[in-house]
């Protein structure tokens, strides 16, 4: 199997959005996808890119992707990667593609002197959790992810909360 991991190109915002939608469908979260191709293109390739996307190909076929951004740990005093999305198309799972994407990102961290690669996983996604544990990931059970969005975000911004 010929595998290639490469950075997404500016003409692939539609492909990236399609992969986001495939991931959302797998996670039963399709109803939450609000992103448009224009929004994805701007985040990845606009005047102030703040997002990165690496595409995995197998034998010339798009197999999956990793969407990530640079974060910072005040504890370590160094940057790291926050992996927003990792997805391998179902027909191509079990071939090492997910591990290759994570290895690629770990390499980015090591090469740049960054301290960590971090992400979240849905608690019901047992296959992914087991896979992540098998590559040395530690589940941070003592942490709870918080989110403020929609009307609550607006209210907070206006000082009503």
Map each language-model feature to its residues.
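A short beta-loop-alpha structural element at the N-terminal edge
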Residues: 4-18
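Conserved GNAT-fold acetyl-CoA-binding loop/helix
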Residues: 17-43
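A short helix-loop-beta-strand connector motif used in the catalytic cores of GNAT acetyltransferases and
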Residues: 43-55, 82
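Conserved beta-strand in the GNAT
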Residues: 55, 61-70
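Glycine-rich acyl-CoA binding loop
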Residues: 56, 94-99
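Conserved acyl-CoA
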Residues: 89, 100-116, 138
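Conserved active-site alpha-helix within GNAT-family acetyltransferase domains
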Residues: 99, 103, 123-142
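Conserved beta-strand-loop-alpha-helix junction that forms the acyl-donor binding cleft
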Residues: 119-128, 147-151
């Amino acid at each position: 199997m010929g595998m290639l991991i490469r950075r997404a190109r500016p003409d692939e915002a539609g492909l990236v959005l399609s992969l986001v939608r495939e991931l959302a469908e797998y996670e039963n979260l399709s109803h939450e996808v609000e992103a448009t191709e224009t929004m994805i293109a701007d985040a990845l390739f606009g005047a102030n890119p703040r997002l990165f996307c690496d595409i995995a190909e197998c034998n010339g076929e798009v197999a999956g992707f990793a969407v990530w951004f640079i974060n910072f740990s005040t504890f370590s005093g160094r940057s790291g990667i926050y992996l927003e999305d990792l997805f391998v198309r179902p027909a191509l799972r079990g071939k090492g593609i997910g591990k290759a994407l994570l290895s690629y990102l770990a390499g980015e961290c090591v090469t740049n002197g960054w301290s960590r690669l971090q992400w979240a996983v849905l608690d019901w996604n047992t296959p992914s959790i087991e896979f992540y544990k098998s590559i040395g990931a530690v589940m941070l059970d003592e942490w709870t992810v918080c989110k403020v969005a929609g009307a609550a975000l607006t209210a907070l911004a206006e000082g009503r909360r």
